[in-house]
Amino acid sequence: MKPKITMGLLLLICNAVLAQTTSTVPLAAVNHKPQWEFHALNQVWLRYNESNPGTTVLGEPQSHTTDIGLRRTRFQAYGEVAPKVFLYFQVGQNNFNRMTNLNGNRKNTFFIHDALCEYSVLGDRLKLGGGLTIANGLSRFSQPSIATILALDVPVFAQTTVDQTDQFSRKLSVVARGQIHRWDYRIVLSDPFPVQSNGVVPPAIGPNATFALKTHRMQQQVMIGYNFFDQEPLKTPYMAGTYLGKKKVLNVSLGAIYQGNATWYLSSGNNGLDTQYAAMKSACMEVFYDAPLNRQKGSALHLYLGLFSTNYGKNYLRFNGIMNPADGLTVAGLAKDAGSQYGNAYPMFGTGKVAYLQQAYLLPQNFLGEVSQHGQLQVYATECLTQYQRFNDQTHMNWSCGLNWLMPGNQSKLTMDLSNRHAIQLFQSDLYTVTRKSTFTIQYQINI
């Protein structure tokens, strides 16, 4: 995708907005009463984790850990403050456990996740907005509705720049999105943050690509999808994980992200080592199916397949551990450009290819008895296969399976999840070892 194409589309949309603003304000707008919604969410984890080899916690070797944490705590306020005018705010915090340490201070402060202003130019056919927002162009899992996550967690690799050049996947952006007949689209122009402001000392430039400390380019994103049955809600930019049989949804989507000079690395030249810049280019094709099997009994089926091409530049690789329960390693000689490798970390992001699959079955409502008294069960499984350039395109797989107890729906949800990951240790020589490690997590979510 070329930046000129995205800019041209945005200019055409801006012209449409200017044409709309020449009309007079109807009397109904003056008398309009704002319609606000307020929501709160908390996700608590109790977790047992088999540690990566050599892991330490506060200086003590630990082959396994048990921890309690807050995966997400959020407050949302949004609504139509005037006809066609939509305002969305979200604040919160993420990944708060015993290892939380912000410059020697465990007092984790809430920060702004979203602050989006949006105007409906042509109803749902065209909405224009701007601000700090999750809206982007790659995949539905790049902008997930956290209250409706189907598995224990989302596939975070789809949030390509999370906490590198964004604010927990949110970016300062201008957005055009909408639905035209059965087509759903979004076009986004984002202004990335410099990587050196993410709170972590960035690695020095080396032979493998890392996010560049110099130069700045805007980021262009686009996503388009076709809905075969029910259309998905368009009120906020977030995309649902599951509708629990309330909708019949089948869509196919294509998405892409492009940013020039996003990463850099050193290459051998005539005069020694030369600094080379690389564009970040990622694309996705995905199929999402979420529909009732038996409406009378309340059973439902969920299937998802996403094929991703993620290009960050030469040999880019980054480890990440969700709410990591550890803080150190006894192993020497590990690669310094790929992030921390202790605890539950694994190579989550990289230049290469990724396939992500997700399946679920929502059991009939009366499987446990009266659903209003006993809730409903949902079983699920996920598989993630990666082929990263840094590992010579060798295939590695992570998987998980679990059970959701919905009491009722996602408002009160208990999840039990077993996951298994490839625990890779990557050395500076680019040699690596592979073992398998598991994690068992119990989550309780309340969403109001």
Report the location of each language-model feature:
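Outer-membrane beta-barrel pore domains
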Residues: 51, 61-62, 244-448
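A short, compositionally biased domain-edge/stem linker segment
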Residues: 20-30, 236-241
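Bacterial Sec-dependent N-terminal signal peptides
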Residues: 1-23
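Primarily recognizes Gram-negative and organellar outer-membrane beta-barrels
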Residues: 46-69, 87, 95-101, 199-202, ...
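Loop-centered beta-sheet repeat module
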Residues: 210-263
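Outer membrane beta-barrel
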Residues: 27-51, 63-196, 214-232, 309, ...
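Active-site rim elements
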Residues: 103-104, 200, 206-212, 271
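Short glycine/proline- and aromatic-enriched beta-strand/turn motifs that initiate or cap beta-hairpins
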Residues: 20-21, 34-55, 255-259, 263-266
